[in-house]
């Protein structure tokens, strides 16, 4: 738990200075929206007094860049081979397509859409707020000032296979929210063996990387 502060605009100006205070909360196995919003409401007036201003919005952000998941995989050429192409040829083509997505935001949008095909399926089945994750993922993809792919694929150094890595924000929960009244979501969590939020995030991340490859 902590606080980060950013100054977005300094006085003088039409609205004076604009300061943002980020309340960082470890939500454990909850998605945490209700908890964070409640804390923001409770602390807003105190923070405003300290800053010498007035409180504005008191709400969570769906750009949860402190709550990311990282998934990696390595695939041998033999597993990449198909009827129409040998493994090294497939490997080179996938790496080239990934590089294209890194260079071109138009390609990156479709690249990331394929990733979200996987995560949305997992999130809907397990009763998560998939719209929040979508919003955060696309904002995260733009964090450097240009729209970038959430997953990248590289030819293995020395050849012989393909390495993939996905990094994206994934705020999910296995307790709280609507889960206690959603028997289908509870069953999906039990079938997946995901009692903890970090395990659910890892599962969703693995689905993301898989759908991006296929």
Named regions from a protein language model:
Residues 20, 99-102, 200:
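Generic hydrophobic alpha-helical membrane-segment signal
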Residues 162-163, 169-214:
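Catalytic-core signal marking the mid-to-C-terminal active-site face
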Residues 26, 105, 206:
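Short, flexible active-site loop motifs that bind/organize anionic cofactors or intermediates
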Residues 1-43:
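Intrinsically disordered, low-complexity linker/loop segments enriched in Gly/Pro
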Residues 17, 96, 197-199:
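Hydrophobic alpha-helical segments, principally membrane-spanning helices and signal/leader peptides
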Residues 29-31, 36-181:
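Glycine-rich anion/phosphate-binding loop at the beta-strand->alpha-helix junction
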Residues 12-14, 156-161, 214:
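Polar low-complexity intrinsically disordered regions
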């Amino acid at each position: 738990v902590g606080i980060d502060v950013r100054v977005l605009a300094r006085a003088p100006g039409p609205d004076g200075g604009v300061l943002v205070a980020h309340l960082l909360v470890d939500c454990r196995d909850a998605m945490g929206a209700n908890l964070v919003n409640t804390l923001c409401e409770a602390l807003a007036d105190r923070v405003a007094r300290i800053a010498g201003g007035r409180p504005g919005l008191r709400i969570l952000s769906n750009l949860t860049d402190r709550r990311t998941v990282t998934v990696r995989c390595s695939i041998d050429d033999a597993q990449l081979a198909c009827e129409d192409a040998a493994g090294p040829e497939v490997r080179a083509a996938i790496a080239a397509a990934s590089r294209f997505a890194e260079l071109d935001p138009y390609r990156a949008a479709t690249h990331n859409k394929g990733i979200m095909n996987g995560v949305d399926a997992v999130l809907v089945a397990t009763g998560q707020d998939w719209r929040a994750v979508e919003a955060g993922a696309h904002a995260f993809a733009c964090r450097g000032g240009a729209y970038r792919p959430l997953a990248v694929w590289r030819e293995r150094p020395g050849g012989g296979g393909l390495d993939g890595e996905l990094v994206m924000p994934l705020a999910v929960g296995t307790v709280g929210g609507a889960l206690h009244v959603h028997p289908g979501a509870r069953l999906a969590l039990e079938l997946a063996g995901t009692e903890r939020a970090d395990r659910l995030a890892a599962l969703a991340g693995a689905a993301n990387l898989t759908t991006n490859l296929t």
